[in-house]
Amino acid sequence: MAADLRVSIAHQTSFALRLAAALSSPAHPAGGAGRNVAFSPLSLHVALSLVAAGAGGATRDQLASALGGPGSAEGLHAFAEQLVQLVLADASGAGGPRVAFADGVFVDASLSLKKTFGDVAVGKYKAETHSVDFQTKAAEVASQVNSWVEKVTSGLIKEILPPGSVDHTTRLVLGNALYFKGAWTEKFDASKTKDGEFHLLDGKSVQAPFMSTSKKQYILSYDNLKVLKLPYQQGGDKRQFSMYILLPEAQDGLWSLAEKLNSEPEFLEKHIPTRQVTVGQFKLPKFKISFGFEASDLLKSLGLHLPFSSEADLTEMVDSPEGKNLFVSSVFHKSFVEVNEEGTEAAAATAAVITLRSAPIAEDFVADHPFLFLIQEDMTGVVLFVGHVVNPLLAA
């Protein structure tokens, strides 16, 4: 993999983990202590890179530095193009995960998209551009966007634009959706799934269904953290998707773990299990999360405020003089993740050193309290989904 692609992916991961830490902070109104959270930083990254393609001046610079570190907007588009080709291609025909990604630009009919922007959107981002009538038919446009997302995500995400989210003053909506469904390389035996106690952050506990297994697993143990890697079946290409469960030792260790990931973006890379070990007690709860939020406030808190303000420069997007008054009113994002015995259904909008050792000690992995998870493509290190589970019983 090219060095510049590695650097871009490192920036994408640090953007992902900054967002995850902000969303999983107990203070955040959308996420916070009471909800399970799932979102796709990859999906948001690509949507914002597309905004950068239509931005000029300080707005473009701010987007480029938030998303890609020191570098140009052109670098972002090249990266997006590689992501769409490398990571987001569907592999279900060859028995690998089903991946469906869609990007849409919905612009009011009074504005015409600049050809250069349209070319980048369609050519590099595989985005669809739609000319719509926000001024007199806002509600109809909203349902058009929603049915587009529903189609792409195989019906898992039915509504990315909530009622009232667009009106006659809306000029531009960017929507994106990501659907992922993978089967575990080693499925869990459903007859072994049993109810057990899951400890909540407030000290109470609930009875939840836990999957268990006696087969060897990829587990790494540290003083205050255990990491489990669950690989998905591969298709005919080199990609290898995996889910990682990061289980803090402390029952209430979730927030400090999220903060650690945020402050050390390379934390995950350094803590990836590469060897299967014999398991002792193994318990992982089934869970299903549907999580949607409006991301602009969160993005502003990470220093991205120009695209959302009246000072936004999105003049590279549309031809008309009205382009000067154009800004991003909101960014709606929705994700869906389900983990069960078969695998995962999710949507959104090294060199091995082998050492001989004495008889292996069986490793326990009992996820009976809140934990973080992420889904990553291991060859590139691209993070597709991040989230946390505070209570596996919460309905999706």
Curated annotation (Swiss-Prot):
Site positions for Reactive bond: R357, S358
GO cellular component: extracellular space
Database matches in CDD domains: serpinP_plants
A GO molecular-function annotation: serine-type endopeptidase inhibitor activity
InterPro entries: Serpin_CS, Serpin_dom, Serpin_fam, Serpin_sf, Serpin_sf_1, Serpin_sf_2
Superkingdom, taxonomy of origin: Eukaryota
Ranges where the record places region RCL: 343-367
Pfam families: Serpin
Keywords, ordered alphabetically: Protease inhibitor, Serine protease inhibitor
Function of the protein: Probable serine protease inhibitor.
Domain notes: The reactive center loop (RCL) extends out from the body of the protein and directs binding to the target protease. The protease cleaves the serpin at the reactive site within the RCL, establishing a covalent linkage between the carboxyl group of the serpin reactive site and the serine hydroxyl of the protease. The resulting inactive serpin-protease complex is highly stable.
Family listed: Belongs to the serpin family.
Protein name in the entry: Serpin-ZXA
Protein source organism: Oryza sativa subsp. japonica
